[in-house]
Regions:
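One-carbon transfer enzymes
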Residues: 1-188
Length: 188
């Protein structure tokens, strides 16, 4: 996102990762809100408490749009109420096909000729939100989960920043991201 020139102000991670040091290097706020302090990734996870902390952090930093990438947590109602139709997510498949944690593997196992990436609005249900943009990636003979996922990531690295830029433009013009305003619509 930084390479695309997008105005990234805050980066939150649910586990230690390179995104935090990248944020720091670009002058953005970096916050590690590690799930370990909320029960980890198992059945003891306190989704409500974790979501409240994420929401408070986003609000404190006056975030306008939330763009999740590699964030391994489905957030609860609190954040969706605070940022209605302003939480984007990306998925390595052409939703609604192959939702969930293993979209690339599932596409390969299904024997499809094409898959791709999707940018959608995040909702309380994983990978079920309204689709905003998609990019098709062909499945090649001999593809493995890793080779296919790398090609999907290339498409995603172009599609996601472009969709975020569009969404920011809509918000700046006073329009909602979803449902999208019809062409020529005036700001509300």
């Amino acid at each position: 996102m930084f390479e695309a020139g997008l105005p990234v102000t805050t980066v939150i991670a649910d586990r230690p990762c390179a995104a935090l040091s990248l944020a720091r290097a670009h002058g953005a706020v970096d916050e590690l809100l590690d799930r370990k302090g909320y029960g980890g990734f198992g059945p003891a996870f306190d989704r409500q408490g974790y979501t409240a902390t994420v929401t408070a952090t986003l609000v404190a930093h006056q975030v306008d749009l939330v763009a999740m990438a590699g964030f391994g947590t489905v957030l609860g109602e609190t954040v969706h109420s605070a940022f209605p139709a302003r939480i984007l997510n990306t998925h390595p498949a052409l939703l609604p096909a192959f939702p969930g944690w293993h979209g690339v593997r599932d596409a390969l196992e299904a024997g499809v000729e094409k898959t791709g990436c999707t940018v959608h609005l995040a909702t309380l249900e994983m990978d079920a939100g309204p689709i905003l943009a998609q990019e098709v990636v062909p499945v090649l003979a001999g593809d493995t989960e890793e080779t296919l996922h790398e090609r999907i990531k290339v498409a995603e690295r172009a599609l996601y920043p472009a969709t975020i830029a569009w969404a920011l433009g809509e918000l700046e013009a006073g329009r909602s991201i979803y449902p999208p305003a019809p062409p020529g619509a005036q700001p509300r």
